Regions:
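Alpha-helical recognition segments enriched in aromatics with Gly/Pro capping
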Residues: 1-92
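Helix-rich, typically C-terminal accessory recognition domains appended to large enzymatic cores
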Residues: 36, 69-219
Length: 219
């Protein structure tokens, strides 16, 4: 009664899974047992993260990347998750780059520092951004929300991460030009960044959401 569904799996399973799932669904449909001949609304095949040398990871070859070692080395789970989403399109094989996790770790640190600078401001500081700053913040935030939303819906996770990186860069440029204040526009920009980043980096965003004064979860 819950068919059809979305289907996600590795390309190496495609032939067998499609053969048997579609065969049985069409067989049941002809018997009048199910309402549709197709079991899937949408099919997506995920690619592989290869070893740094471009070969498939294998224990026998000794080229497997251990995620626990990366997390325990000080980078944490979120930097690893973000890099896995950023490394390549969902359906394209890509070699592991040892420089990748340090890069996403720096990105998350920059986002963290922006939020910390905002929450550490004196509450008596200016509550109003000047008109130019307000427009820049709103334009950057809304355009990023639109791009990230579209990319997530299309499973383009790597470009979603790239858009969030561009947003952080843009926020730093605005900060360097006009500073950070306690305005609604800065709050909106930072809270929006936290919310769109949450599916990719759930741990740091939960902490940042609390830092922004929320008692509920960001998820």
């Amino acid at each position: 009664h819950w068919m059809p569904v979305d289907y996600y799996n590795g390309a190496d399973h495609a032939v067998a899974h499609l053969l048997y799932s579609r065969f049985w669904m069409r067989f049941f449909y002809k018997l009048g047992l199910v309402p549709t001949p197709e079991p899937f609304k949408r099919m997506m095949y995920n690619a592989y993260i290869m070893a740094p040398d471009g070969q498939k990871m294998s224990k026998s070859k000794g080229n497997v990347i251990d995620p626990m070692e990366i997390m325990d080395s000080g980078y944490g789970a979120d930097a690893l998750r973000v890099y896995e989403m950023f490394i390549a399109p969902y359906d394209m094989d890509a070699p592991w780059d040892p420089r990748g996790v340090p890069g996403t770790y720096r990105f998350l640190n920059r986002a963290w520092n922006l939020v910390q600078e905002f929450v550490d401001k004196d509450p008596n500081d200016s509550l109003d951004a000047n008109e130019k700053t307000a427009q820049e913040l709103l334009r950057l935030t809304h355009s990023t929300i639109k791009k990230v939303t579209r990319d997530i819906e299309d499973e383009k996770f790597n470009t979603a991460v790239a858009s969030m990186m561009e947003m952080v860069n843009g926020l730093y440029k605005i900060k360097e030009s006009h500073g950070i204040d306690m305005s609604d526009e800065w709050r909106f920009a930072l809270e929006s960044l936290i919310q769109i980043l949450a599916p990719f980096a759930p741990h740091i965003t939960e902490e940042l959401w609390r830092e922004m004064g929320h008692d509920d979860t960001v998820h």
